[in-house]
Amino acid sequence: MEEMKRRRFLGSLAAATVAAVGTARLIVDPQPRTFAQVPLDAAPTSGPVAPSPVGLLPPPPLSARIPLPGGGALTTIPGDGDLLALTLDDGVNSDVVRAYTQLAKDTGARMTFFVNGIYNSWTDNLDLLRPLVESGQIQLGNHTWSHPDLTSLTQSKVEEELKRNDEFLKKTYGVGAKPYYRPPYGKHNGAVDAVANELGYTVPTLWSGSLSDSTLITEEYILKMIDEYFVPQAIVIGHLNHLPVTHVYPQLIDTIRDRNLRTVTLNDVFLRTP
């Protein structure tokens, strides 16, 4: 019976997603629609994490958090376990930001968004996204203000990119992103890391697997990447840029559930720094 209910839920999720975002395109609708029509002024949750309506495992307890590893970029979750960190970058397309946020709200999946504040999607979707940020279900990380190759910039420009985005996140969402920053294109070096460290961004956060959707690709290829990289202790990168990924949400959630993976934010895994 529970399996039938879950299948009905995912079926309605798929139908609503298609109805909302339509066929794949590279432009944003003048009035973006969510794929599940719910009030945007819902209060943030507090206390214990509510059970997932699709049977996803809850995040680990606070007592399970571990110290951040030192000595370089973070690419996987240390140790053995059942954790999956789905991390999503940029925010080019407001519809995709909205759809991923609604997916999290509807399923209980936990995610980390690495934000480029230059994109309007982060203010367009503020009312929907902020309660999930405040509850800790979605974490925000610093991906720089405008997505430059940091290794091509002067130290002052690197500082400007990180500080401007940091200030945007604090002003808009009331949260800081430290210590996690993701260098655009994964490109960083000692000089970049030194500037970031001075600002409190001590953890360059890369990945162990990718949905490869920074550019427009097919739904079939995204499903192939999900199958390959949704594995225990992985940090997977995806992008909030193009619509095909929004058409495969039911399969994405099914893979997480069927493999008994536990979606986590980075803050769910690691002890917070002072």
PLM regions: where:
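His/Asp/Glu-enriched short active-site or ligand-binding loop at hydrolase and phosphoryl-transfer sites
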Residues: 187-229, 261-273
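N-terminal secretory signal peptides and thylakoid transit peptides that target proteins
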Residues: 1-17
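Active-site beta->alpha N-cap acidic-glycine motif
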Residues: 49-142, 146-149, 157, 161, ...
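Acidic-and-aromatic substrate-binding clefts and catalytic sites of carbohydrate-active enzymes
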Residues: 91-95, 116-125, 149-153, 182-188, ...
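C-terminal region of N-terminal signal peptides and the immediate post-cleavage residues
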Residues: 22-40
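Catalytic grooves of carbohydrate-active enzymes
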Residues: 231-267
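CE4/NodB-like, metal-dependent polysaccharide N-deacetylase domain
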Residues: 105-112, 139, 155-187, 223-238
